[in-house]
Amino acid sequence: MSEVRKNDHRLMQVLLAPVISEKATLVAEKNEQVVFEVAPDATKQEVKAAVELLFKVEVNSVNVLVQKGKAKRFGRFMGKRKDVKKAYVCLKPGQEINFEAEAK
């Protein structure tokens, strides 16, 4: 864990954006989890350290997944949206991240 904490510059690049969707909102209300879009090469340990550093909360666990990009048609050409790596961050009881307050 101390090896991950040493490089704070790397941790600032791990979290790309919070995922604000219907599913992410339901997960946040039910299970005290927050969903982030993360860098494609980010590890669970880096995501945990980045969330703890940026939001000053305690993280219980991290689950990651890679959402494959959809195949889309651009005129007569077929293209593909980029793959997105998401992290479901489970916070310890009593902890929460309020994005409205963080933005102000």
Curated annotation (Swiss-Prot):
InterPro entries listed in its UniProt record: Nucleotide-bd_a/b_plait_sf (IPR012677), Ribosomal_uL23-like (IPR013025), Ribosomal_uL23/eL15/eS24_sf (IPR012678)
Keyword Ribonucleoprotein carried by entry: yes
Gene3D superfamilies, per database record: 3.30.70.330
Keywords assigned by UniProt, alphabetized: Ribonucleoprotein, Ribosomal protein, RNA-binding, rRNA-binding
Single biological process term from Gene Ontology: translation
GO annotation, cellular component aspect: ribonucleoprotein complex; ribosome
Family affiliation: Belongs to the universal ribosomal protein uL23 family.
Name under which the protein is recorded: Large ribosomal subunit protein uL23
Species for this entry: Paraburkholderia phymatum (strain DSM 17167 / CIP 108236 / LMG 21445 / STM815)
Gene: rplW
